[in-house]
Amino acid sequence: MSKLIPVIKVNNLSFYYDTQKILEGVSMEIYQSKVTAIIGPSGCGKSTFLKCLNRMNELESEVRVEGRVEFFNQNIYERRVNLNRLRRQVSMVHPKPNLFPMSVYDNVAYGVKIVGWRPKLEIDDIVESALKDADLWDEIKHKIHKSALDLSGGQQQRLCIARALAVKPKVLLMDEPCFGLDPIASMKVESLIQSLRLRSELTMVIVSHNLSQVSRVSDFTAFFKGNENRIGQLVEFGLTKKMFNSPHDSRTREYVLSRLG
C-alpha cells in the first residue's frame, strides 16, 4: 500500500446536544484518496460524527464540541475558520436528495456561482463535467434546463453528488447515499462511488448500514457503538478487509456477523 496521508485527523472528539452527550472520545484519521466507511447500529452517532467533520452540526441549536478535528493540520473548530470555504472543501451529500426547486443546470451551477463570478461558458463546462463525473450526463443531457425535481430518486441523488463535485471538494461526506433507493438506483450510486474511487483523488467518507456495499466500496472502516449509557464510541478502526475478516474486538465481530451472516 502506498503511503497514507491523513486529510482529516480527529483527536478525542466528544459531541453534545445541549447537555446530552452523543459522542465520546473519538480519535481516528481519514486518509487522502481513500474511502472510509462509518458503520454501526442505529443511534450510535454515525451521522453526528460525519457532520462534525465539516461543522454541519452547528446548523442545529445548542451543540457543543470537545476535542479537535484537523483538516490538513488546521483545527476546523477555531473561530477564524471560514465556514463557507470549509464546507466547499469538505462537502456533504445527505440521505435524501435536497435539491433546489430549479433546473438541473442551476442546481449544479449554484455552488459555483456563489463562490464568485465566472463566464457562462466556463460554468457550462463545469456543469457538464460535474454531471459526467456523477455518471449522469448521458441520461439527462437533453433536459438539463428542466426541473431537477422531475428526475427519478436515484438521478436526484446523483445530481446532489454532481452539485457537490462541481465545487471541487477535497473530501466528500455521504450520509446513507442509497437511503430509500430501489436496488437498481442503489447499484448506480454504488458504481459511481467505485468509479470516483478509481479515477479521482477525492477522499470519501460514507455512513452506511449496508455492510455488503461497504465491503465493496471502502478501503477503511470505522465501527461505532453506543456504550452502556448509549453514548457513541469508536470501537474499532482499520482496513475494511481486515475488519470484516478478522476484527480485533468481539463487538465488531458480532456486529459484522449479524449483518453479513
From Swiss-Prot:
It catalyses: phosphate(out) + ATP + H2O = ADP + 2 phosphate(in) + H(+). Keywords: ATP-binding, Cell inner membrane, Cell membrane, Membrane, Nucleotide-binding, Phosphate transport, Translocase, Transport. It is a peripheral membrane protein. GO terms for biological process: phosphate ion transmembrane transport. It is found in: Cell inner membrane. The keyword Magnesium does not apply. It comes from the Bacteria. Its main location: membrane. ATP binds at residues 40-47. Belongs to the ABC transporter superfamily. Phosphate importer (TC 3.A.1.7) family. The complex is composed of two ATP-binding proteins (PstB), two transmembrane proteins (PstC and PstA) and a solute-binding protein (PstS). NCBIfam families: PRK14258.1. Part of the ABC transporter complex PstSACB involved in phosphate import. Responsible for energy coupling to the transport system. This is Phosphate import ATP-binding protein PstB 1. It comes from Nostoc sp. (strain PCC 7120 / SAG 25.82 / UTEX 2576). The gene is pstB1.
